[in-house]
């Protein structure tokens, strides 16, 4: 039995993990701005993560046998992760990273709605309230008001659609992980999905001729860092989450806020004070939804 971490320590660690996830997206934007393609970034990140997870499992002597009944479901989950990865990185390439991640934060809401639709959970007024509050905050963060809708949508629309597509895809992955794939070791499950993602995007990118690497050293550093940050964050979760209380995991919702800060520092991406307020409202509402669910 692993020793539990105190709530304060857990929150600090998860905020650091969230910052690493956010840094991965900021580094990805640097790679994109210097000629790297979305497909190349996904293949690099997925392959690196799969290798790290494979090493972790070897060191811990984790069985790598996949039950035959779950192989098809794992393949489907891998396809969904590939779609999610492509959609989210495409969004990051088009709009500020923090805003892309805020739209992606609708994923927990979609997961709850899917669980309700499938009869796995009972609708609750508290959850409805959290969802409405999150959407209000998102509208503020995107600066989408009736008088500015057309102008803002012309600038942000494509990125918002990509990010929402990522949220939809990952909501189905969440659902599969919570139900049909729940019996698998988390490391093996993540390794399989990540490996499928790497193979699919590599094959698709090769056929489409869209595996362009960054054209200069700055872009290559961005490509390397996005892989490092993601691998560190993902592997850390497997060590930290088993030692935390359910309520502490709400700190993972810090990722969009961290992305806004990092993008401001390293990319010069700025948003208005009202948009920052909207970001905090959205993150707070999603955290509320998660804590209430647990």
Segments and roles (model prediction):
Residues 30, 34, 49-67, 135-153, ...:
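Membrane-interface helix-cap regions at the ends of transmembrane helices
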Residues 20-25, 60-100, 104, 140, ...:
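Specific transmembrane alpha-helical segments of multi-pass solute transporters/efflux pumps
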Residues 1-16, 108-168, 274, 280-294:
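Juxtamembrane helix-loop boundary signature in multi-pass membrane transporters
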Residues 9, 33-83, 110-114, 133, ...:
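Transmembrane alpha-helices of multi-pass small-molecule transport proteins
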Residues 43-44, 100-106, 176-199, 230-265:
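Helix-helix packing/entry segments at the starts of transmembrane helices
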Residues 40-51, 81, 88-122, 166, ...:
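Specific alpha-helical transmembrane segments that line the substrate/conduction pathway
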Residues 31, 41, 91, 117-119, ...:
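Hydrophobic/aromatic residues within transmembrane alpha-helices
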């Amino acid at each position: 039995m692993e020793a539990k971490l105190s709530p304060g320590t857990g929150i600090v660690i998860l905020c650091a993990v969230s910052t690493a996830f956010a840094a991965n997206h900021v580094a990805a934007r640097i790679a994109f701005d210097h000629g790297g393609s979305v497909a190349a970034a996904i293949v690099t990140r997925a392959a690196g993560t799969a290798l790290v997870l494979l090493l972790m499992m070897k060191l811990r002597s984790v069985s790598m046998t996949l039950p035959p009944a779950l192989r098809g479901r794992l393949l489907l989950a891998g396809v969904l992760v590939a779609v999610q990865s492509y959609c989210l990185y495409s969004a990051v390439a088009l709009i500020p990273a923090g805003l892309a991640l805020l739209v992606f934060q609708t994923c927990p809401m979609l997961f709850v709605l899917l669980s309700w639709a499938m009869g796995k959970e009972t609708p609750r007024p508290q959850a409805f309230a959290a969802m409405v509050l999150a959407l209000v905050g998102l509208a503020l963060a995107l600066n989408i008001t009736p008088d500015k809708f057309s102008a803002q949508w012309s600038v942000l629309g494509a990125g918002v659609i990509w990010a929402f597509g990522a949220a939809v895809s990952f909501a189905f992955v969440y659902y599969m992980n919570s139900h049909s794939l729940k019996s698998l070791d988390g490391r093996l499950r993540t390794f399989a999905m990540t490996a499928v993602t790497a193979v699919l995007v590599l094959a698709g990118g090769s056929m489409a001729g869209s595996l362009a690497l960054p054209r200069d050293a700055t872009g290559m550093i961005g490509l390397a860092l996005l892989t490092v940050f993601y691998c560190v964050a993902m592997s850390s979760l497997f060590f930290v989450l088993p030692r935390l209380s359910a309520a502490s995991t709400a700190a993972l919702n810090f990722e969009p806020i961290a992305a806004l800060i990092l993008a401001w520092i390293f990319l010069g991406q700025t948003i208005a004070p009202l948009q920052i307020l909207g970001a905090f409202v959205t993150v707070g509402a999603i955290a509320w939804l998660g804590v209430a669910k647990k």
